[in-house]
A protein has these predicted regions:
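Conserved C-terminal structural/oligomerization subdomain of aldehyde/semialdehyde dehydrogenase
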Residues: 23-138
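Short beta-strand segments
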Residues: 7-11, 74-75
Length: 138
């Protein structure tokens, strides 16, 4: 277990009723700051670290202060804020209000969260070879 943050929900062990297989409890930590290991590690599991912030710019700075960049999440009903904040986030995907990413949208991250894209038009480019032809003909 990580030190200093407060366990709000979940924790170690499997969820009730799931004795077989590889499952972990959905887990929420509070009192997290961006210097803690739980905030600096790319965790592939149902783990949420709640990091307080004062301003929108502060939240963007915290979100971008990582070597990873798979997905960011924005919760707001303000569509202008969504556009403004999403442009500043250094991640391959931005999920708004828990709607999820469309199945035909490109999937992939920035920085150490992956190179390239899967799905969508950008995902197809991985299987194509581009050729440049220069010069002129009579």
């Amino acid at each position: 277990m990580y030190k200093r943050q407060k366990l709000v929900a979940g924790g170690t062990g499997k969820p009730d009723g799931l004795d077989k297989g590889y499952f972990v409890k959905p887990t929420v930590f509070a009192d997290v700051n961006n210097n803690m290991e739980v905030a600096r590690t790319e965790i592939f599991g149902p783990v949420l670290s709640v990091i307080p912030f004062e301003t929108e710019e502060d939240a963007i700075k915290i979100a971008n202060d990582t070597t990873y960049g798979l997905t960011n999440y924005i919760q707001t009903q303000d569509s202008e804020k969504v556009q403004r904040v999403a442009r500043k986030l250094r991640s391959g995907m931005v999920d708004v209000n828990g709607a999820g990413i469309a199945v035909d949208a490109p999937f992939g991250g920035f920085k150490h969260s992956g190179i390239g894209r899967e799905a969508g038009e950008h995902g197809l480019e991985e299987f194509l070879e581009v050729k440049a032809v220069g010069g002129w003909s009579n």
